[in-house]
Amino acid sequence: MQYTLKARHLAVFLLAILAPTTAAIPAPQALTSMVTGSVTSQPIGHYEFCRAFRAECNQRLASRPAPKLTPHGWALLKKINSSVNGRIHAMTDKDIYGREEVWAHPKDVGDCEDFALLKRRELAAKGFSLADLLITVVRKPDGEGHAVLTVRTEQGDFVLDNLDNVVKPWYQTSYTFLKRQASFNTGRWVSIENGRDVVVGALR
């Protein structure tokens, strides 16, 4: 009887630990994943970044389904997103380098794409595949261009954004999604076919 009671207490304790983490992963919706199209133009900043860091851009990856996001993986996404957002101070490329479109791994300051690059590197170091860590170009509601990191998962595409400490499914943002890195080649970019659908869905 005492053993059974202890086992029951242990089960309740484990559920108390695991349940909030598991429940935090958003449930799939109609706009779970982006629909990508053909190969499109590579941002000039990424082109120049690839010339300096060829190893990050010459990986050709086998086409495969997006992996299932585990509670541990979900916790890592949230941790790294908020950690990088807190450690790096946002500044424009013009203010940092005196010119636009300089993509780099930031140390103290960086533009939006620099935040995305650092999150990509840190998640890859934790075991995420580069095929699922895709820098993405979007348009903000005010028309300004912006860059975020998209993470492909079986449960859908999630966005890590330097303007938001909350990791969200892409369809819960107010952005128009334009293009992103190809999952099959880290140096190629593909268009996003349903990038405007998410804006319509967010306004409903």
What are these regions (language model features)?
Residues 2-11:
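Bacterial N-terminal signal peptides that target proteins for export
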Residues 10-12, 123-124:
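General helical structural elements
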Residues 2, 24-204:
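A structural boundary/capping signal
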Residues 11-20:
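Bacterial N-terminal signal peptides
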